[in-house]
Amino acid sequence: MIRKAFVMQVNPDAHEEYQRRHNHIWPELEAVLKAHGAHHYAIYLDKERHLLFATVEIESEARWEAVASTEVCQRWWKYMREVMPSNPDNSPLSAELKEVFYLA
C-alpha cells in the first residue's frame, strides 16, 4: 500500500456543513473510492486554521488519480465547492504532504 497525506481548506463559516456532507457521503462515491483501491481514508479538521488534513492508503497512483475523472467524483467536487476553496475544475485546492516519519 502507498500512504498519502494532503491538506485542504474549508471555508470558515462551513465547518459544520462540511462535516454534515461527509456524514452522509454518497454510497456511489464510497464505492468508486473502494473500487479504485482507496483504503483507510480519513479527514481531520483544524477548526482554528480552517485546515483539513487527510490520509489515505492506495493500491496504485494511477488508480487513485483515475478517481478524479469519474462522474460521481466530478459531481461531488461541484457539490463541495461552496464549502471549500476549489480549483477552476471544481477539485479542492490541496497540497500533498511528504512523509517524514512512519512507525509501523
From Swiss-Prot:
Highest taxon listed in the record's lineage: Bacteria
GO annotation terms (biological process): rhamnose catabolic process
One Pfam family in the UniProt entry: rhaM
Group of enzyme by EC: isomerase
Principal subcellular localization: cytoplasm
Localization per record: Cytoplasm
Keyword Cytoplasm found: yes
Active-site residues from the entry: H22 (proton donor)
Gene Ontology MF terms in the entry: L-rhamnose mutarotase activity
UniProt key word Ribosomal protein: no
GO cellular component assignments: cytoplasm
Pathway: Carbohydrate metabolism; L-rhamnose metabolism
Its EC number(s): 5.1.3.32
Function: Involved in the anomeric conversion of L-rhamnose.
The protein's assembly and partners: Homodimer.
Family membership noted in the UniProt record: Belongs to the rhamnose mutarotase family.
Protein name (database record): L-rhamnose mutarotase
